[in-house]
Amino acid sequence: MAGLRRPQPGCYCRTAAAVNLLLGVFQVLLPCCRPGGAQGQAIEPLPNVVELWQAEEGELLLPTQGDSEEGLEEPSQEQSFSDKLFSGKGLHFQPSVLDFGIQFLGHPVAKILHAYNPSRDSEVVVNSVFAAAGHFHVPPVPCRVIPAMGKTSFRIIFLPTEEGSIESSLFINTSSYGVLSYHVSGIGTRRISTEGSAKQLPNAYFLLPKVQSIQLSQMQAETTNTSLLQVQLECSLHNKVCQQLKGCYLESDDVLRLQMSIMVTMENFSKEFEENTQHLLDHLSIVYVATDESETSDDSAVNMYILHSGNSLIWIQDIRHFSQRDALSLQFEPVLLPTSTTNFTKIASFTCKATSCDSGIIEDVKKTTHTPTLKACLFSSVAQGYFRMDSSATQFHIETHENTSGLWSIWYRNHFDRSVVLNDVFLSKETKHMLKILNFTGPLFLPPGCWNIFSLKLAVKDIAINLFTNVFLTTNIGAIFAIPLQIYSAPTKEGSLGFEVIAHCGMHYFMGKSKAGNPNWNGSLSLDQSTWNVDSELANKLYERWKKYKNGDVCKRNVLGTTRFAHLKKSKESESFVFFLPRLIAEPGLMLNFSATALRSRMIKYFVVQNPSSWPVSLQLLPLSLYPKPEALVHLLHRWFGTDMQMINFTTGEFQLTEACPYLGTHSEESRFGILHLHLQPLEMKRVGVVFTPADYGKVTSLILIRNNLTVIDMIGVEGFGARELLKVGGRLPGAGGSLRFKVPESTLMDCRRQLKDSKQILSITKNFKVENIGPLPITVSSLKINGYNCQGYGFEVLDCHQFSLDPNTSRDISIVFTPDFTSSWVIRDLSLVTAADLEFRFTLNVTLPHHLLPLCADVVPGPSWEESFWRLTVFFVSLSLLGVILIAFQQAQYILMEFMKTRQRQNASSSSQQNNGPMDVISPHSYKSNCKNFLDTYGPSDKGRGKNCLPVNTPQSRIQNAAKRSPATYGHSQKKHKCSVYYSKHKTSTAAASSTSTTTEEKQTSPLGSSLPAAKEDICTDAMRENWISLRYASGINVNLQKNLTLPKNLLNKEENTLKNTIVFSNPSSECSMKEGIQTCMFPKETDIKTSENTAEFKERELCPLKTSKKLPENHLPRNSPQYHQPDLPEISRKNNGNNQQVPVKNEVDHCENLKKVDTKPSSEKKIHKTSREDMFSEKQDIPFVEQEDPYRKKKLQEKREGNLQNLNWSKSRTCRKNKKRGVAPVSRPPEQSDLKLVCSDFERSELSSDINVRSWCIQESTREVCKADAEIASSLPAAQREAEGYYQKPEKKCVDKFCSDSSSDCGSSSGSVRASRGSWGSWSSTSSSDGDKKPMVDAQHFLPAGDSVSQNDFPSEAPISLNLSHNICNPMTVNSLPQYAEPSCPSLPAGPTGVEEDKGLYSPGDLWPTPPVCVTSSLNCTLENGVPCVIQESAPVHNSFIDWSATCEGQFSSAYCPLELNDYNAFPEENMNYANGFPCPADVQTDFIDHNSQSTWNTPPNMPAAWGHASFISSPPYLTSTRSLSPMSGLFGSIWAPQSDVYENCCPINPTTEHSTHMENQAVVCKEYYPGFNPFRAYMNLDIWTTTANRNANFPLSRDSSYCGNV
């Protein structure tokens, strides 16, 4: 044996380093040393010497879960395993290497490791993460799922416990890629004290506490934006310091409970509490670092560190412990944690004095303990070497000292035939500080036999440990004996708080079994017939070996050679094999007991499997029924674990297995069949769920088998109970016998006799039933149904009908109310109780009523619940309907009353006007009777379209053509018509416009009367007379009294105290306008048309143009093609008549009249310029300023009116017209359909005006605010009219005539009665302005001359009488203010403004316009001028939006004349009878009644003149004058729907020179209306004979009792 070589010392450290790496897997709180770099050399076995098991460093790398253990003795397998592990292809880590840098010893620091899943279609489950060294720690991360292309993070904690560079690896156990490694490193350094000396660092241990609960203080959450979180930390104490603390103060639950109050500022407190809690846990890390007693103190301390990585502020307010002992001392100061840091902050420290720990409970435990606290394994074999040695040749025994804890005696039994020398005993470096070798003095000579070689003592006391290590012995034979040990802490049997340390030997042979040792185990996973063979063989070997260990003798021999053989005393209790085996069940002896479960329901319970070894373990879990030979296996388990075979069900399939953390909610393929395959890394734990689905009622017991390669077989018991839900209601079971009876005594129904029928009291019977849960399962009744209806039905109702739960053997009362309807004496219904498990319990509700009392009680049964609501709704809607009828009736009555009041007002205005007017020159009554009667005989009377103040005298029964189309509601009362001449014209003008122009003129007239205008202005009407008017020639000695018949609007005088008088003097009676040759087509029926003499003499002085009033008309400052002009600028003046709102634009008329007055201001010296060509007129016209001429002229006119002698216009006041005054119908204006209001002004003005003319005699009464509407319609095709803008007159060639575009309306002054009579009929005579004529008050009449002839006073001497031949003529009176200034298209139905118009806008107040004078139209009316000049009736050119107040004229100065038609009643004349071949681009041209015989007729317009409404057609049309009105709402857009189309009057209106002279001339000019085809979508025709029927019956009947016609008497 000489020459025995001793192995190199490095080989010992090599093996110790390998064991050290294994210890790091368990994360025990033991100081772990870095695997020594100097221990690089492996054990070099000597030749012919036993080779010990050598632990290579690469062998510490763990295999994947898919592979079983690699043979530790096969280098090729080890190398392939290492390559597979370090591939790292499964996950990508960031950063690639984690370096913590320099950290102080004992001070933890944390960093985040990010793991990315690069797979696009699969997810990765991270089962666990652990470190190989004790310096690095990872909080538990069970079942962390990394989605595809997703990432997760781990917090790695570095706690250095020794100086120098520390490098290690993290192992990430994944489900898809196995175990992946990751490199981590750090450097530990000591803290240097102020004296410069290094402190001695005591041993430090790392603990991760468990956060038990987090509670939120609601009071704090409501008052502030912060939340107070109560965090309870539960920590299992597994080190020496905690063990000492535990002995001081802990109870039997083995935990140290701490409560920490934290104030956290939440960014979004509105989140759910769970979200806030999870957010806090994700960013808050709490660790404990326990230290041993230091050199300066005997106290052990536990330091608490907190790391906060979030952004919110955390204030640690308080920390408390729940210890009942006084030995624990807590040091804490409130601290504000920094945010987003990596270093931990120390917040508290716990200390416990050793003196307290040595006394008390520890001593009590020792006194009550009768068995050794340390138990030794009996045998440990030496690993096989090269020599064929029996493993039993060398045996090591561990003797436990009964009275000493943590001390073992190691015995060596030498079976060799020679002696062995033990040279040295050493431990691995990792366990040097935990274990100490005692009683080994040096090399020992050991002959064959049993020898006590040394003692092993556990250096740490009262700590919970779980240690795997080896004790190495070197010998003189070159062999190194390795004694494998497992030392762990276990609770004492007495259940005390102390732990006992157990040392096992020899189990390493089975733990970490390689494929070479178990070649068939992996093949047995298929669960075929070989499975039982493999399991039984391995189990028998393990069991027999344990028996040898248990029954082996222990020899005691001292080292001096004395030999003593003695048997070791047997322990009082035979140790079982179960206690010997390391169990895979975390709780040995656990029985999963499933409570009562309903059929077809599933209940899941979980248990935990744990790998107690330092090597990976493969598990196969399956129910007993799936094992190939369950009976044989149960018999084996009975021997091992003492299982009761009688209670085991071998075939039940009611138990299945599932993972506690399933992958995406699904199980693996094996789990579907109840089989699970798990791979556990060292110390790894997993939860496994057992699903119990009872198939039948009753109890069932079975086993869950755990096949593994560590202990071969393990098991856990399961027990379940299948039960059913069962209810009783009223003591009866559900089904046929479950009848619940309602007892209704007869005395109860006798109350029906005492109840009144009106009381309608509900008779009901209530009964309570007890619902009992007689089954083992808790029942939740989700709903109660009566014949399928929830809670009530068929008279039954369950009170407090809501969901309730019943535990087993509990009950609850329900109340059911029955309300009979007394239709049947026997009522049977079903009551169903539906549970949350969809079980339905059916019972029968049975009610019997006395049959003879049913009729008596049926009377007191109330009606349905909705009956009262139905009647209330009915009454409500009927009341609403009645209220609506009342409102409509009230509105109609108010409308009638307002109409009546307006009529009275107009009568008062008429009377006042007639009283204020002086004597006037009127045509004799004989002329009226002869002429008007002939006219009426031809056409008959009509009450439609009459002017205002003319009462209807006849029903419209004699209407011929379209009478059938009119409303059947035609008034049948007698309508007495006044004598008024009628002016047949298509267009009408608005008195509102006229009044507005008057108001503006009053302010703007600053120019003197004598101021001259350029020639272009004077020639404006020259062409107008040639093209559009038949000039009426007056005798040279025309009487100036003619001026007296022309008056100005009353409201013009209002601005001058309502007494201003203005007289316009005609400078030359011989003024004339040339008339082109051609036949004049009048707007009169053919019977009244007279061919005009073509050789009519011209006026000698000037062409007749409308004479301007005393107030100058304002200029038009507007562009001519601006349809939007009227809407915003024109004030609205609305008056309602017959339900029609009339709106009057006034500003345009103001502008038109202003321009007319400009024309009038031209001196007589410039009259000859009118005879120049049209081209000159056009060119010169645009440059005429106007504003500067206004004020002087106005003042002059006002002065004339004040000083002048007004003649009393002695008009023939007939009785009929007086009656018209009494009517006083309020004027209603029609909405304009043209944007430009052509105001027709007369050049004639009476020299004297009565100073007391009532304001009410004007078109617009200030008292009633009645407004006459002007037509705003202008043909868009007027090129000349488009050149009028900014106060200038632009006159194109041959287009000087003022154009009056038809608004297609027939507002001819029809009375309100006739309008109502014809409302609603297509053939009606009413329109939207059906009462224009009716609503206009009495106004003085005016006459007009063409704008080019500003006739002075010298033209018509005051004494010269004028005789007009009005045989077939219709008066065409036009107000001065009703001539539009410009022509521009406008939207129809423009709104009108209020009567009070602002004067600064150039608008006349509505009451300041003069009404138009009436012109008599009779069958043989002659008006002879003094000089014999014939006066030819001239067709007035269509005036755009012009207004002529005929009715006002009749009631005013022409009181005895019939109310004339007004220009805004032009629509009364059919366009079929008008020829509108000429546009009116010259707004200054004003129509006149005096037309020179030589002036060209406008009916023969030159071909170069564009037609406003179409081409001029001279066709012989029927003698129809369709003075129709329409109530159609579209009349505001297109005018009357009976607007005339293309018919033309071919007759002229000649003047009969033999007409007798009237002393008081009413109409100085009669205008023949030129026809312009208008827009009429319906082409309606109206026979004029409807006006003449009455006149035919009565020869003395006035001209036309219809107000649309005016005749002179």
Swiss-Prot record:
Record keywords, A-Z: Cell membrane, Cytoplasm, Endoplasmic reticulum, Glycoprotein, Membrane, Phosphoprotein, Signal, Transmembrane, Transmembrane helix, Wnt signaling pathway
Region (Disordered): 946-974, 991-1014, 1108-1144, 1159-1178, 1304-1340
Subcellular location: Cell membrane; Cytoplasm
TM spans (from-to): 870-890
GO annotation terms (biological process): negative regulation of canonical Wnt signaling pathway; negative regulation of immature T cell proliferation in thymus; Wnt signaling pathway
Secretion signal span: 1-40
Polar residues: bias regions: 952-961
Stretches assigned to the Extracellular side: 41-869
Source species, domain of life: Eukaryota
Annotated GO CC locations: cytoplasm; endoplasmic reticulum; plasma membrane
Modified residues (Phosphoserine): 1122
Topology Cytoplasmic: residue spans: 891-1609
Region (Required for Wnt-signaling inhibition and LRP6 degradation): 696-916
Glycosylation (residues): 343, 439, 522, 593, 709, 846
Tissue specificity: Expressed in thymocytes.
Keyword Translocase: no
Listed PANTHER family: RW1 PROTEIN HOMOLOG, TRANSMEMBRANE PROTEIN 131-LIKE
Family: Belongs to the TMEM131 family.
Protein name per its UniProtKB record: Transmembrane protein 131-like
Protein's organism: Homo sapiens (Human)
Record lineage: Eukaryota, Metazoa, Chordata, Craniata, Vertebrata
